[in-house]
Each structure stands twice: as C-alpha cells, then as structure tokens.
Regions:
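Secretory targeting and sorting signals
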Residues: 1-27
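Secreted/periplasmic proteins that engage bacterial cell-wall peptidoglycan
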Residues: 28-137, 171-172
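Catalytic cores and adjacent binding grooves of peptidoglycan-active enzymes
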Residues: 104-190
Length: 190
C-alpha cells in the first residue's frame, strides 16, 4: 500500500511539473520585484538566461549583442563576473537607438490590464537597468533615477561607457541567469 501511494504521488508530482512548465508565462505566478543580488563569486561564463535575454532583445529591437562576461581580474563588483549581466550595444547620441531603448523599456515596464506593473521585467528577473545617465532598479519599482558611476566626479568628466551612453546594461537575478523564472521557463517549454 505504501509503495503504491509513493508511486502515485511521484506520478502526480511529475504530471503537475509537466503541466506547469507547459503553461505560458502569463498563466504562471508573477514574480515579485527582484532584490539586489550583487556579485559574490566569480564564474564569468555566460549563463543561459542571460544569453536568452540578449538574443531576445537584439532579435526584437535590433542594436548590438554586447558582452556578457567580464574577467575575474577586472576591478570592482559586477554581475558580468557571474555571467548574469548583458550589455545591449546602442548609442544614446542617435535618435534611432534612443527610440529602440524607449521601446524596450516601455515593453518591460508595461502595466497589465489588472494594474500589475513592470510585468515582463519581473518575469525576466531583471534586477536593474542602466542607460543614458539613468538607472531603473526592481528594488525601487523601476523608478527612473539619475545615475553617475562611482568612478566619475561629474558627467562631464565621465566616459560614454561609464555613463552607459554606448550600451544599456541589464543585470539579472541568479534565478534569471539560470533561466529559472516564469519568462524563461515558458520559452523553454514551447
């Protein structure tokens, strides 16, 4: 009797997992806003979720597929050193790239009919975005705030790269880097 019950429970668990993984992301529970998860180790190989996100952005919005990884020997703390940050190559000096960036941000931060905000960004496990002297962080509900790199005294003395004017930086949670949030699970299942 116990063996039969164990088999039934195992079968039910497998069936539930298959059903959940085949649901579109919209049918899965919406993730909460990501908390800040800074780099704590160094494993710079590009994580599957980071690669998926980068390809999705470039395929849908154009622009260039910039770096994901950064060497462990590079200074400072960076999610690039854990393979969970993507730099989307754009130029803030061109209206075309500013429009591309605005289109992505609008899509990521769109409000659902039921009032839930930032749905796609939350499903993708985005921790924060830095672009064109501004930062949008999940832990501040993606509110647009001025950004100045700690390596710069002023914007005038700061390079385009440190100001994130030649790329959009997108950092992911560890789960998202592993492609283990609802957006990735739904895409992998289809």
């Amino acid at each position: 009797m116990t063996r039969r019950l164990t088999r039934l429970l195992s079968l039910a668990t497998c069936a539930a997992a298959l059903v959940l993984s085949s649901l579109p992301a919209q049918a899965m529970e919406l993730e909460d806003y990501a908390t800040y998860q800074p780099q704590t180790g160094c494993s710079p190989s590009a994580k599957p979720g980071t690669k998926m996100l980068g390809r999705w952005i470039v395929n849908r919005f154009d622009g260039g597929f910039g770096p994901i990884s950064r060497p462990c020997s590079a200074g400072g703390t960076s999610e690039h050193k854990e393979g969970r940050a993507f730099d989307w190559t754009l130029d803030a000096a061109t209206s075309r790239d500013r429009q591309r960036a605005a289109a992505l941000l609008e899509r990521l931060f769109r409000v659902r009919a039921d009032g839930e905000a930032h749905v796609l960004a939350r499903r993708m496990g985005i921790m924060y975005i830095i672009w064109n002297d501004h930062m949008y962080s999940a832990y501040n509900r993606f509110e647009k705030v001025d950004y100045l790199s700690s390596s710069c005294r002023s914007r005038r003395s700061c390079s385009k790269t440190l100001r994130h004017r030649n790329h959009m930086h997108i950092s992911l949670t560890r789960r998202a880097g592993r492609a283990n949030t609802s957006w990735y699970v739904a895409r992998l299942a289809s």
